[in-house]
């Protein structure tokens, strides 16, 4: 059992997410390896879209699965239905049960779920580090603006 208070979090790197994840997947995998050697908890967050009429990230579909290119090194996979990962009761319980207070964050969308999660983690008093070479967006032109926001 890990006793680290640090967690590496990968947000929404799923089949239905932007194709731009392919540009950062090697960086994410390298960061996962780094986090494992540092003794961090590794967490994967998946978005499930339960809104009627939507077609992507639907529960039980191939689109909501984590991308096959990503290293999955733990069973810590939590589902959210809103942009902020802290709204996942299971993820919040995991944080509390493990005394986690510091997060290293990767994923998509930089202007959506990553931004919302990092904002709310910071607001809750956690230390948050966004790995700039491990985030992407549907609109790549917005990534530099988001990096300025975080850094």
Each model region followed by its residue ranges:
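Flexible, glycine-rich phosphate/dinucleotide-binding loops
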Residues: 17, 51, 137
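A short alpha/beta connector and helix-capping loop motif
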Residues: 21-35, 39-47
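Short acidic, Gly/Ser-rich segments with clustered Asp/Glu that frequently serve as metal-coordination loops
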Residues: 14-20
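Short glycine-enriched, charge-decorated loop/helix-capping segments at active-site entrances
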Residues: 22-25, 53-59
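Active-site loop/turn elements of alpha/beta-hydrolase fold enzymes
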Residues: 47-49, 133
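Active-site-adjacent betaalpha module
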Residues: 1-7, 30-38, 55-151
């Amino acid at each position: 059992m890990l006793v680290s208070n640090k967690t590496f979090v990968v947000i929404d790197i799923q089949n239905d997410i932007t194709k731009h994840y392919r540009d950062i997947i090697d960086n994410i995998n390298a960061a996962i390896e780094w986090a494992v050697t540092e003794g961090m908890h590794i967490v994967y967050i998946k978005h499930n879209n339960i809104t009627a009429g939507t077609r992507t990230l639907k529960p039980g579909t191939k689109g909501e699965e984590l991308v096959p290119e990503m290293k999955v090194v733990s069973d810590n996979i939590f589902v959210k239905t809103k942009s902020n990962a802290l709204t996942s009761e299971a993820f919040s319980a995991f944080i509390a049960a493990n005394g986690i207070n510091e997060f290293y964050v990767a994923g998509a969308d930089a202007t959506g779920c990553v931004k919302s999660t990092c904002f709310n983690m910071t607001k809750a008093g956690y230390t948050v580090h966004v790995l700039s070479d491990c985030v992407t967006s549907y609109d790549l032109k917005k990534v530099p603006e988001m990096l300025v926001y975080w850094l």
